[in-house]
């Protein structure tokens, strides 16, 4: 069963002035803008002060929980509005949330003396479900699901939304993905040697790492066909090791997605690569792409 993308919102460093853009499936392609160069963020690592490139999107250096939740609400409401859904859809449409950040920036600010949470967070309860709980009460929506699987969080949220739609458990779905700056994620990726230390991002050629950034986006999905149609999904877990990637596992996931879409490799016109910029991961991904889609153009964003 195909899934139509009825509307979408996007807010990132590459959108004009970091503002949210909302568009429906009848609006055509997302407007292109001149690429924005990354800014910088600093961290203290093993007694050293380190500055790395970073794509800032939101006005505040660290979003409070209240500010973040308001931004996410705007994405949900605008996606539903652009999809021409009824006003009550935010209360009865399942919402699938993918992120690694959640309210981490708020938690970090709460360590500062005198900082008071605007939404009254329980300082003894560090849960990823606070965002879901907030929208459960704000929207009166019981069907809100959270996904935190590192770089694949929003992709997994999208896959499970598609599975629920195909199973007939719902008629519509909203998929919300977001990332905002927090020191834990920034320092974690740096400690793993995954972050670039220069503004140049050249995966598959110079494996110097990738550039982190902030963003938020939301998709409004329905069963059927549309101007933009999601035809196939697939997911998998690479069990080769904690720090290495198996090219065979990457190839199997792509083959599964093609099978789910009833498509042949020759029909694929573009691959948006993972392209994380680490030598082992890029080598495995490149090998899988060469084996399955040797002549298909690739884009790393």
Write out the residue ranges for each language-model feature.
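Short conserved active-site loop signatures built around small residues
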Residues: 154
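Short, high-confidence coil segments that cap the C-terminus of an alpha-helix
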Residues: 169-171
């Amino acid at each position: 069963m195909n899934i139509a993308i009825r509307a979408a919102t996007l807010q990132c460093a590459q959108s004009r002035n970091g503002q949210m853009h909302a568009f429906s499936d009848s609006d055509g392609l997302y407007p292109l803008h001149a690429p924005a160069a990354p800014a910088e963020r600093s961290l203290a690592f093993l007694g050293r002060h380190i500055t790395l490139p970073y794509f800032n999107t939101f006005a505040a250096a660290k979003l409070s929980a209240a500010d973040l939740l308001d931004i996410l609400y705007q994405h949900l409401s605008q996606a539903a509005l652009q999809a021409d859904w009824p006003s009550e859809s935010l209360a009865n449409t399942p919402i699938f949330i993918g992120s690694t950040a959640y309210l981490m920036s708020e938690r970090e600010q709460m360590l500062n003396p005198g900082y008071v949470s605007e939404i009254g967070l329980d300082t003894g309860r560090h849960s990823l479900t606070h965002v879901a709980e907030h929208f459960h009460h704000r929207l009166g929506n019981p069907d809100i699901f959270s996904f935190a699987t590192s770089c694949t969080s929003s992709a997994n949220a999208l896959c499970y939304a598609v599975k629920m739609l195909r199973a007939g458990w719902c008629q519509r779905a909203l998929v919300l993905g977001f990332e905002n700056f927090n020191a834990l994620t920034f320092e974690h990726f740096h400690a793993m040697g995954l972050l670039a230390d220069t503004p140049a991002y050249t995966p598959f050629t110079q494996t110097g790492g990738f550039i982190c950034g902030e963003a938020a986006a939301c998709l409004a999905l329905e069963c059927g066909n549309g101007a933009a149609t999601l035809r196939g999904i697939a997911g998998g877990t690479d069990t080769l090791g904690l720090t290495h990637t198996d090219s065979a596992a990457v190839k199997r996931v792509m083959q599964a997605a093609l099978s789910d879409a009833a498509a042949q490799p020759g029909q694929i016109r573009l691959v948006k690569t993972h392209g994380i910029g680490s030598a082992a991961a890029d080598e495995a991904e490149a090998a899988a792409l060469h084996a399955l889609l040797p002549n298909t153009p690739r884009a790393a964003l």
